[in-house]
């Protein structure tokens, strides 16, 4: 007998989180009832897809109570390295709450092992939920707190994994690259597709990140899908990586540098592709002050230099400019740049991203250099911004002007390959 609607609350609301069987167009469907605001059923099928049905198509409720998964008891395995996983948000090791439809963090070590049991074959997991925020809400204060937690974790773990939303993961990776000198791997990882979707990259990325966290690496890296298939992940230096696509699973790319390594899946075999800081090569050190009054300005045709005057009048000490081509702005900017450079640090980067800034080719570029602007070499604009925040937080203006030209964490390659 088909159930009837219960009072003013729709039947779909009453059955949220329950497993039901529905008949539609001569076929039988089973799944979990998801939230719906239309009065119809939205069913999460076992294959991960959501399908909508009318209430009258319901045949029966299969479970009265929501399914409660059994969480395995974790036993520390001798011979495996201890790895700390710090969550800041994102979709890695998260689950769908079938009552609300939201993806929620499930972040005890037992919950992670339940979702990605293969992790226990790679390392002993110790998990900590530091934040559960969207990555666009990350602020410099969060970077500092995160760096301090990682610094502490590195003292008694062989590596650290940081799960992070993908939109600003490259900002956070760059920030920790400058604030932390690390003798062990610090691996950022995220997911482009939420863990309830059949195309989710969450589990594979996490397994590859765990492998990276146990390898011969001594720096901050990002580990994400290397292609749109589930065949390998790439390990990118934290100061040379950028998210270059809104939704593709291989959105993260190394810019002006090769990836550090490739981790094949499911074998988890590692191939090193370029130079890297090795495990134990550097001493553990934390330098965590950041100057907030640094700004990134994207030049476009017709943009007035008044924007420089505005920030300068507000006490800003650092300016990163995304110029055109080789690193140019309008000649109208030259006089303002000269005044700003007297007591501030101004770094020129390129909107092109790939390639190297060179302001010695055209007259405008030479005028920019004579005004006191510093070429940003092959640094990404976001990396130059964070580097300048770090330098001005820990050094004088004159020291920062000299140090910004030098590679601190591998952010400047000695040559550019064409």
UniProtKB/Swiss-Prot annotation:
EC number(s) on file: 6.3.5.-
**Annotated ranges, domain Asparaginase/glutaminase:** 81-407
Q: Kind of enzyme, top EC level?
A: ligase
Active-site feature positions: 91, 166, 167, 243
Describe the reaction catalysed, as an equation. L-glutamyl-tRNA(Gln) + L-glutamine + ATP + H2O = L-glutaminyl-tRNA(Gln) + L-glutamate + ADP + phosphate + H(+)
Whether ATP-binding counts among this entry's keywords is yes
The superkingdom of the source organism is: Archaea
Citing just one GO molecular function, the answer is:
glutaminyl-tRNA synthase (glutamine-hydrolyzing) activity
- Is the Manganese keyword given for this protein? no
Q: Which InterPro entries match?
A: AsnA_fam (IPR006033), Asp/glu_Ase-like_sf (IPR036152), Asparaginase/glutaminase-like (IPR006034), Asparaginase/glutaminase_AS1 (IPR020827), Asparaginase/glutaminase_AS2 (IPR027475), Asparaginase_C (IPR040919), GatD (IPR011878), GatD_N (IPR040918)
| Biological process, per Gene Ontology | amino acid metabolic process; regulation of translational fidelity; translation
Query: Keyword annotations for this protein?
Result: ATP-binding, Ligase, Nucleotide-binding, Protein biosynthesis
Which protein family is named in the record? Belongs to the asparaginase 1 family. GatD subfamily.
Per its database record, what is this protein's job? Allows the formation of correctly charged Gln-tRNA(Gln) through the transamidation of misacylated Glu-tRNA(Gln) in organisms which lack glutaminyl-tRNA synthetase. The reaction takes place in the presence of glutamine and ATP through an activated gamma-phospho-Glu-tRNA(Gln). The GatDE system is specific for glutamate and does not act on aspartate.
| Matching HAMAP family | GatD
Q: Please describe the quaternary structure of this protein.
A: Heterodimer of GatD and GatE.
What's the protein name?
Glutamyl-tRNA(Gln) amidotransferase subunit D
Upper taxonomic lineage: Archaea, Methanobacteriati, Methanobacteriota, Archaeoglobi, Archaeoglobales
UniProt lists the gene as gatD
């Amino acid at each position: 007998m088909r159930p009837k609607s219960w009072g003013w609350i729709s039947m779909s609301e009453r059955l949220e989180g329950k497993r039901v069987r529905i008949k539609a167009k001569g076929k039988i469907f089973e799944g979990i009832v998801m939230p719906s605001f239309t009065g119809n059923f939205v069913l999460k099928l076992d294959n991960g897809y959501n399908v909508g049905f009318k209430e009258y198509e319901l045949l029966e409720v299969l479970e009265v109570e929501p399914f409660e998964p059994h969480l395995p008891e974790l036993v520390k395995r001798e011979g495996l390295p201890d790895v700390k996983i710090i969550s800041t948000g994102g979709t890695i090791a998260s689950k769908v709450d079938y009552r609300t439809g939201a993806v929620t963090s499930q972040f005890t070590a037992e919950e992670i092992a339940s979702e990605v049991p293969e992790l226990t074959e790679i390392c002993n997991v110790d998990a900590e939920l530091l934040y559960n925020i969207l990555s666009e809400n990350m602020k410099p204060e969060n970077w500092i707190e995160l760096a301090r937690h990682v610094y502490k974790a590195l003292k008694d773990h062989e590596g650290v994994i940081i799960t992070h939303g993908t939109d600003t993961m490259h900002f956070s990776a760059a920030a920790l690259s400058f604030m932390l000198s690390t003798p062990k791997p610090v691996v950022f990882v995220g997911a482009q597709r939420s863990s309830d979707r059949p195309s989710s990259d969450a589990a594979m990325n996490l397994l590859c990140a765990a492998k990276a966290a146990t390898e011969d690496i001594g720096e901050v890296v990002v580990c994400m899908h290397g292609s749109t298939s589930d065949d390998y992940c790439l390990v990118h230096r934290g100061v040379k990586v950028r998210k270059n696509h809104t939704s593709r699973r291989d959105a993260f790319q190394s810019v002006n540098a090769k990836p550090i390594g490739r981790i094949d899946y499911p074998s988890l075999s590692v191939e090193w592709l370029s130079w890297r800081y090795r495990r134990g090569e550097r001493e553990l050190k934390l330098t965590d002050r950041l100057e907030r009054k640094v700004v990134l300005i994207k030049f476009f045709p017709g943009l007035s230099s008044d924007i420089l005057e505005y920030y300068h009048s507000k006490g800003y000490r650092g300016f990163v400019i995304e110029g055109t081509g080789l690193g140019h702005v309008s000649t109208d900017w030259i006089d303002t740049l000269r005044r700003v450079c007297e007591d501030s640090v101004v770094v020129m980067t390129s909107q092109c991203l790939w390639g190297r800034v060179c302001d010695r080719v055209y007259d405008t570029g030479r005028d920019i250099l004579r005004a006191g602007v510093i070429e940003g070499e092959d640094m990404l604009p976001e990396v130059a911004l964070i580097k300048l925040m770090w330098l001005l937080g820990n050094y004088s203006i004159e020291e920062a002007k000299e140090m910004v030209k030098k590679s601190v964490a591998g952010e400047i390659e000695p040559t550019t390959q064409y």
